[in-house]
Structures are given as structure tokens and as C-alpha cells.
Amino acid sequence: MGKITAIKKLKRLYRVDLSDLDEEKIYLCEDTIIHFFITIDKEVSETDLEEILAYDQFAQGKSLALYYISFKMRTGAEVRKYLLEHDINDTDQIEQVLSVLTENNLINDKSYAENFIEGKISMGSSGPYQIKQKLLTKGISNDVLSEALKEIYSEEKQIDVAYKLASKLSRTYGTRLTLKQLKDKIIQNLMNKGFSYSVSSIALDSLELEADEENEMDLLYSELDKVAKRYTKNYEGYERKQKITQALARKGFSYDDISSALRDYTFPE
């Protein structure tokens, strides 16, 4: 049987000196001191010491976790990682901390996911697939986030957000791209932001975009000048026209417009 010989208050913890035990001194938080009525001359067995140290891991873990979540909402996985990074290494005690905080609704992955999704919808910047990937990196389970997305981010809302993004892209690139290029860019951009092809297509169709023939031809002639310079160095005649036609078609210009432009085009020498 050992005995507590001294207790000293430090900045954050208490140093407890022991005699006749394997440990000569231990460091405990105030919660542990109070919970076990730690006082000088109190007798402590090795079994008592193990219990005290186990509880202290829980108490310190809970204190750290409460500090961590005081700034903003955190997921259970984020809190677990934070505790491990701050030397709370007893996994059983970590899970107990998470259990207590979850029971008191201080950690709620579903609420976290719902708030995150609503924020992204409000910002109008992300589709469901992008949101899902971000939440997965925060340790939220696939089941929890799938349920939250289903409840909050309906297809109707997705189309509304995608439409606003598509409209903005149309205003930005409308005069710089052909109609085909613009449509391709809008679809690709929306899918990169996490919208399905189906939702992206519906949003695009809702814009009812039409070609500006004069702008299309201006863009064609501008691109024709660039392509002609490149291919005139190594090709001539029919082969050159074929190379140029193929290059312009890949950029979204129609074969009829390309043929019309080439008919009276003067190639650089």
C-alpha cells in the first residue's frame, strides 16, 4: 500500500508525489483530484492508482474535447483525432468521452452534416457529390451524410443552385466561346462542382441558350487565323484544309461554317 506524500498545483495540472508505489509522481487534473478525494497521507494501492490514472485520461480528455468544440461544431472523428494528438492515448477513455459528449448533444454528426449542407446551399457553390466528399473527409459516416443530403438537398434545390451557377458562367463566357463550347464548359463546370450530369443538363436547358451567329463567325475567323498559321508551315492544298477543318471542328465549330470561312480565306504565306 502506498501513500500520497505531496500535492502541488501547477499551471494546468496537479503534481501528486507518491511513496511505496511503482510511480513516484503522477500528474492529475482538478476533476480527478476532486473525484477521488486526493489528499496528502491518503493511502493508495496499485489497483487504486490504475483506476485513478484511467479516470484522469477520461477527465483530461473531456476537458480538452470541451475546449476544442467551444470554438465551433466538430465531428466525432475530429474530436477523436484532436485527443490523440494531445496525448490522450487510452482509446477506451476516448470513446467514453465521445459517448458522454454525444449523449449531451455536444457532438452530433447529423446536425454537423445538416448545417454544413445548408451552408453550402446558401453559398450556392457546391453540388451534393462535392459536399459528400468533403463531409467524408471529416469522418462522417456515409449513412449519416446520405440521409442528411436526402432530407435537405432535394433535386429541385440542386437544379436551382446549378441553374444560378450556369447562368453566371453564361454571362462570363457567352461572347468568348461558341455555343457548343459554352454548353460543354457549363456542363463540365457543374459536374466538377458535384452536380450529376442529369441535374447539370436540366440547368443548362433551362437557360435556353441560342447561338449569336455574328459572334460565332467572329470567333471562327479568329481561331482560323491561329490554326492556319500553324498548319501552313507543314501542309498545303487539300491536306492543309483537312487539318484545319478537323482542328476547328474539335473546338466546336460547325462544318458548314468552317467550309464557308475556308472558301474565301487567304492563307498566310
Curated annotation (Swiss-Prot):
Domain of life: Bacteria
InterPro entries to which the protein is assigned, alphabetical: RecX_HTH_2nd, RecX_HTH_3rd, Regulatory_RecX, WH-like_DNA-bd_sf
Disulfide bonds: none
Example of a GO cellular component annotation carried by this entry: cytoplasm
Keyword tags: Cytoplasm
Keyword rRNA-binding: no
Keyword presence, Metal-binding: no
Compartments (UniProt record): Cytoplasm
GO aspect biological process, one term: regulation of DNA repair
NCBIfam families on file: PRK14135.1 (NF010733)
PANTHER family associated with the record: REGULATORY PROTEIN RECX FAMILY PROTEIN (PTHR33602:SF1)
Family: Belongs to the RecX family.
Role: Modulates RecA activity.
Annotated protein name in UniProt: Regulatory protein RecX
Organism: Lactococcus lactis subsp. cremoris (strain SK11)
